[in-house]
Amino acid sequence: MYHVTKSKEKLWIIIAGLAIGVVASVLVLLGNPKNMGFCIACFIRDTAGALGLHSAGAVQYVRPEIIGIILGSFLLAVGKKEFSPRGGSSPMTRLVLGFFAMIGCLMFLGCPFRMILRIAGGDLNAIFGLVGFAAGIGCGVLYLKRGYSLKRTYRLPASEGSALPVIAAALLVILVAVPSLLKFTTATEENPSPGPGLFRAEIWISLLAGLVVGGLAQRTRLCMVGGIRDAILFREFKLLLGFAAICVSALVMNLILTAVTSGTYFTLGFESQPVAHMDGLWNALGMLLVGFACVLLGGCPLRQLVLAGEGNTDSALTVVGLLLGAAFAHNFKLASSGAGPTDNGKIAVIIGIIVVIVIGEFNIASNKRKG
């Protein structure tokens, strides 16, 4: 019976990964930036810009995909009676880790989800990110083995657990009904292609895609960090199957779309990749920070959105940390661009790695004192 259940879990994870890869490629076909059908970090950054939290005009748009992931997870959790409002597990630590995870993402120009999609689009620069990501997860696993553990969660009122889904729904209403309250990346005659924020699929298509991905990720517990972490810690590879399935299906879709449309959705190489730079060292270090921070958080940015939809206020606070990190990165020129990383960004990544190490050491020391 156990083996049957485990096989069904693996099958669901593979199906979810294949479906998510297809959805991501279709979003690019319908208007999203190349190799960015989904990117949790980039889309939170765009949303921060739309809310006026930063002034980088190239990246301002409330991304319905983020709203959809939160609401998709929320609706499925409620439907399956898995909605469980809880929180109080080292909230400020999670906020800080979320902040620095975003700094790492914007050094690399993508979250773990986009890293996979970049590889599927032929971007070999993302391989450096994958190496750094795995190394960062390895660092985090060492801390887990030494006794790192955040505090237990506590049950909370439903109003607390519903806060982020309600905010997401309110943002959707504003985007559809009162868009004048938001900022948008716009094209001009002088600059007809100002940045990624200009490229987007239709609102309802993006929302539907987010709902599908959010629901599938909630159903399968899909996590980009969890796959590598579990493989190292427990020799358990089922979450890695989802990781691989996304890459394979997105790759196949990109090759098909390149063959049957006038666009180019797969370009193998390092140069001229969309929304990417070629500095391998800083691609690796940025994702090392992401992997390290996310292991200590307990999941990748996608997983944090899904958990927040399920009622976890600690994950909701992590999402706030990601939002603040995105705003800070663009206000203080920490984010990379196609031209490469900035000096400020390099300093921020090094500081971030040090901060994550300090958090880990203090946590282990505190847990040892408590016995």
Describe each PLM feature range:
Residues 1-371:
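Membrane-interfacial helix-loop segments of redox and metal-homeostasis proteins
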